């Protein structure tokens, strides 16, 4: 399955990614509804990574456009108090959105989207002031499941399998096989990269370009990743495609692309690498040419 992913991601201003085939939105930054227009009505599930305003301020209009019984479903970190406040305000502000369902999530919780598809949350340390027991920022992994016939039964005839299914139950004949279709880091420091291993598509933030630049910043601000760290880590993982976003607007297109190519060469990254440039909406990202 080649997913149709459209997104906008500029640090400080707005971030969102729409996965069309899954009717799913990752974050809901400003401008999503007027950008997607009627396509925004296809969104059934919204997964918010954290409460920073550049990830949630497009939600009011999007929710009003999509509001119907039980949809859209909005999922968010359980201790992100500003998002809970946004739920309360939106229901007071607009009667039409009262049927929207809001779901707080903890770490490693699963959300079943359909029989063969679920999303799993993963806590990160983006929010500096979060206590160890608090979940204020999440990444997400999207899994597709299929039932595969157990090796003990592969040589049996259809009739024999039917009889066994009646006797033992169909579920006893198969194993569940999970495929990690897509992973989304949200805003996060460069950490716990092993959790993204074996994903087909990783969307990861790269706010700054180099470790040296990150080292000069204040340590009490919310934490982010660098392009250098991400590509160094991805080089050791089994990932099919990398999408980089959340670049700071301080960088030009030329600076970002040159750095991507330089670090891909330095760390021997050979998988396709796509990027979302600051200030630009990128349509159908996976069908565009990779930068490397």
Predicted regions and their residues:
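Acidic/glycine-enriched edge-of-secondary-structure segments
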Residues: 17-25, 39-52, 206-225
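Conserved beta-strand hairpin/beta-sheet module of binuclear metal-dependent hydrolase folds
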Residues: 1-39, 138-142, 148, 175-185, ...
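Active-site-proximal loop/helix segment associated with metal-binding centers of metalloenzymes
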Residues: 117-197, 201-206, 210-211
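Metal-dependent catalytic neighborhoods of phosphoester/phosphodiester hydrolases
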Residues: 58-65, 85-92, 252-261
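Active-site neighborhood of divalent metal-dependent phosphoester bond hydrolases
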Residues: 72, 79-106, 250
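Active-site metal-binding motif and surrounding structural segment of the metallo-beta-lactamase
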Residues: 32-77
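Active-site neighborhood of phospho(di)ester-bond hydrolases with catalytic His/Asp-centered motifs
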Residues: 25-29, 44-54, 76-77, 183-188, ...
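Binuclear metal-ion centers of metallo-dependent hydrolases, dominated by the metallo-beta-lactamase
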Residues: 97-114, 191-292
């Amino acid at each position: 399955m080649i997913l149709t992913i459209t997104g906008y991601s500029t640090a400080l201003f707005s971030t969102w990614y729409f996965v069309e085939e899954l009717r799913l939105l990752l974050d809901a930054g400003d401008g999503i509804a007027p950008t997607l227009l009627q396509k925004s009505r296809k969104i059934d599930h919204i997964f918010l990574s954290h409460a920073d305003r550049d990830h949630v301020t497009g939600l009011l209009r999007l929710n009003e456009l999509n509001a119907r019984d039980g949809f859209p479903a909005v999922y968010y970190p359980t201790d992100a108090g500003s998002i809970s406040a946004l739920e309360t305000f939106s229901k007071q502000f607009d009667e039409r959105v009262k049927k929207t369902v809001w779901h707080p999530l903890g770490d490693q919780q699963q959300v079943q989207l359909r029989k063969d598809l679920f999303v799993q949350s993963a806590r990160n340390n983006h929010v500096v002031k979060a206590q160890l027991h608090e979940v204020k920022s999440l990444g997400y992994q999207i899994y597709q499941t299929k039932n595969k016939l157990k090796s003990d039964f592969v040589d049996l005839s259809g009739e024999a399998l039917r009889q066994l299914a009646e006797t033992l139950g169909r579920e006893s004949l198969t194993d569940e096989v999970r495929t990690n279709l897509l992973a989304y880091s949200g805003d996060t420091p460069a950490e716990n990269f092993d959790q993204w291993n074996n994903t087909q598509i990783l969307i990861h933030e790269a706010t700054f370009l180099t470790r040296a630049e990150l080292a000069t910043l204040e340590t009490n601000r919310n934490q982010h990743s660098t392009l250098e760290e991400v590509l160094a880590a991805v080089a050791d993982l089994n990932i099919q495609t990398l999408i980089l976003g959340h670049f700071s607007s301080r960088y030009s297109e030329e600076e970002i692309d040159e750095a991507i190519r330089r670090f891909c060469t330095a760390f021997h990254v050979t998988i396709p690498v796509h990027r979302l440039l600051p200030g630009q909406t990128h349509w159908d990202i996976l069908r565009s040419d990779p930068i490397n």
